Amino acid sequence: MGDAPRKLTIGMLKAMPRKWDVFGNWAIFEEQFDRHSNEVDVFITPECFLDGYAVTEKDWTAKLFDGVAQDVQESGYIQRVRELAKETQTHVVFGFTEGLEGHFYNTALLVGKDGKVVGKYHKTHLQHSDHRFARGEDLPVFDLDFGRVGMVICADRRWPESIRVLRLKGAEVCLMPTYGMWHVNNEWWMRTRSYENQMFVCFTHPNVALITNPKGEVEAKLQSNVPDVLVHEVDLLRVTNDNHLANRRPELYGVLADEEHPSRQAAYEPPQVDSSAS
């Protein structure tokens, strides 16, 4: 007999938040969570959902941003997320702007089904308006009752090393709140990240919710213009270390992390092309 399935039901909020509208965005979250929390083990929001990813606004100021940033210890919204998680026995990944020690962070907070904060992730790769945030300095993984998960946020997915680190730390699922690019190229990226790491990736965006599986296939997808939740069950027994992960050659990859590696310092001059020869 084979191993019993390790089933996990994931709920992914697909809804477009309004910038600066914390009250209205919370109402969307609460309505959809109330509707679907009894169906899922984990519920995920898009990136910075609470403030509507206001960091990109042209009228952005630090003073305005401070008005929507949340302190994890003091925020009434965060406290309510914890209460909802405990009441429904649901793990929650909640995206918001965090104010911490004089800095702003693009944060994904992981709340356990007991209502306790399991941990949080600060976006590590910042581009464009995101430079108004401070950078995260870690790629943590978290143990939950069903298995081990990791989180990245939006643009972090552009760097393959980010999700590879999570997988090498034992993560079976990458939970990914996002707000930016979501077209077909992104679908290829997510399929590739899943395939090369033999894991599930849960891409949660205002316009689309997408789950890709260890074979690099689209496992589930929901795309529409109205608030909704993708609910889908995955079997974590499909996550293995066989195949290409087992055949890695890490002794050859030092150049990826070593800024002083000789191969990175070697000067390279591309060959000159004689345009007159054509």
How does the language model describe each region?
Residues 22, 27-113, 164, 183-191, ...:
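Cys-nucleophile CN-hydrolase/nitrilase-fold catalytic domain and related Cys-dependent amidase chemistry
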Residues 99-103, 132-133, 201-203:
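Short loop/turn motifs at secondary-structure junctions and domain boundaries
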Residues 104-122, 208-225:
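Amphipathic beta-strand/beta-sheet edge segments enriched in Tyr/Trp
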